[in-house]
Amino acid sequence: MAPSLETPESIDDVFANPIKQKPQLVAPEPQNCVGPDSQQAGKADSCAGCPNQAICASAPKGPDPDIPVISARLENVKHKILVLSGKGGVGKSTFTSLLAHAFATNPDSNVGIMDTDICGPSIPKMMGVEGETVHVSGTGWSPIWVMDNLAVMSIQFLLPNRDDAVIWRGPKKNGLIKQFLKDVEWGDLDFLLVDTPPGTSDEHLSVNSFLKGSGIDGAVMVTTPQEVSLLDVRKEIDFCRKAGIKILGLAENMSGFVCPKCSNESQIFKASTGGGRALAEEMDIPFLGSVPLDPRIRMACDYGESYFDSFPDSPACLAFQGVVKNLAMQLGLDSQDVLPDE
């Protein structure tokens, strides 16, 4: 018989309380125990003399008191967008950086990126602010400003050395994500983009739980044409549906290559099962568009420059503009207001 994974008692409780765990007791619960999750745990008369008293008294109980604080901090953020993909290496962080630069081309729009890829933060490098450090004031942490209307917050800014590994378990990751939402002075933003790691792990559960009170507009899925990528994106779509996160659409990255010499398009990563468009139709979600491969995107990210400013007429830039306009429609916005024509 094949092994099976243990199913949680309530999936809804997993989404609602991603970091609330039953304390690890050192002895069985006595007959008159009020319960380790009770508000009186460790304090009731029946707790006297119990080996678990100190453990139960220090365990978190009830609703997270920081949720209202987060909602108040983000009350002036108009749109909160998650960028997700079940698969690593599909260009999700690259997509986030391109999307931020696209939104920021409108000088009237203020944009923020929150990098929740705790163990592999690459957004600072792509935005050209890798060597910056966070300033802490009496009112909170100041994000790093890439330009007048584009800010970034990442764990990379908190590391003593650029190459330091972040070897953290879930609770520490969750705590930092909460700080990014609760303590960072995001100010008035039109768009807050949340770059996430691959999969459906602690980071995703925490972001969803912490932002429930202030509202998430939805998630953008990023994939490449291969079925290996699509398999994991299906799981990510299922995660969003179970978590109650609206799926704003799916974008296919690295979709073909347009030769700069002859303009002929080649399918380097040819779709074997229909690619992103077919998956969007299968899962009944909007298809935002396809962005072709362009080595200059990699170059712009390596040098921390805006691909939109450097290569505005390239096939990939024009395709990405279409993705942005389709996303604007899903947000209920006028595409001309989000990405004005020159």
Swiss-Prot record:
Subcellular location: Cytoplasm
Sequence positions that bind [4Fe-4S] cluster 2: 259, 262
Binding site for ATP: 86-93
One of the GO biological process terms: iron-sulfur cluster assembly
Swiss-Prot/TrEMBL keywords: 4Fe-4S, ATP-binding, Cytoplasm, Iron, Iron-sulfur, Metal-binding, Nucleotide-binding
Chain residues that bind [4Fe-4S] cluster 1: 33, 47, 50, 56
Protein name: Cytosolic Fe-S cluster assembly factor NBP35
Name of the encoding gene: NBP35
MF terms in GO: 4 iron, 4 sulfur cluster binding; ATP binding; ATP-dependent FeS chaperone activity; metal ion binding
